[in-house]
Amino acid sequence: MPSQELLLAIIRQESEFDARANSHVGAQGLMQIMPGTAKLVARNLKTTYSKSLLKSDPSYNIKLGTYYFNSLLEDYDGVFPFAIGAYNAGPNRIKSWVKKYGDPNKDEINFIDWIELIRFKETRNYVQRVIENINVYKYTLNKEPIKIDGFFRQ
């Protein structure tokens, strides 16, 4: 399960905590989940899908968005920069970038270098900002000093 700090960092970047946010591509609510993805996640959770609740019920949006992000985190063996990138650009893009640039989880490339090579400026910036915000929330919520060793693995 993603940490509270990670979820807050995603929400901050996705919607700036605006529960009624709507993107130009149709993503909705706090976690800016796409309706098609939300429908699939609701089915997996055995809960009712409601497009209107994506923007009117923050807990519903967070429940679906968290489940989806957790599935990405599992797909990438807890390597959250991959899951963050996949949440923004889609899972297939991450797989192609790992194939093209190497896998930082296998020490084929440094994580920072891999992030810098992300082809889409929006996704590269997104991953960088979410990672920055994780550290802000770790300190804000827990007064926990930031540790670099093992940081990129949940």
PLM regions: where:
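Catalytic glycan-binding domains that act on GlcNAc-containing polysaccharides
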Residues: 1-154
